Amino acid sequence: MDLTEQFEASIAKAKGLPSQSNETLLELYSLYKQATEGDVRGEAPSGFDFRGAAKHAAWETRRGLSSDEAMQAYVDLVERLTAG
């Protein structure tokens, strides 16, 4: 199975995970966005949009990570979450 197939399988697995911490959800979100869209673009949402600002900040931490690196990190994270 190539990396793209592993990534797609991990996305499906992640949807079936039990409830996760906000930190873990932001990590999954940021890796997914970096893998599928690349570096974050545009301005951060208003500080009053706490959820949007947190998502933007999490994605920003992945700046410079290649699509393949982000996919692999996502696959690894989902594997850790489903193993335990």
Q: What do these predicted ranges mean?
A:
Residues M1-G84:
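A charge-rich, low-complexity, intrinsically flexible signal that marks solvent-exposed coils, linkers
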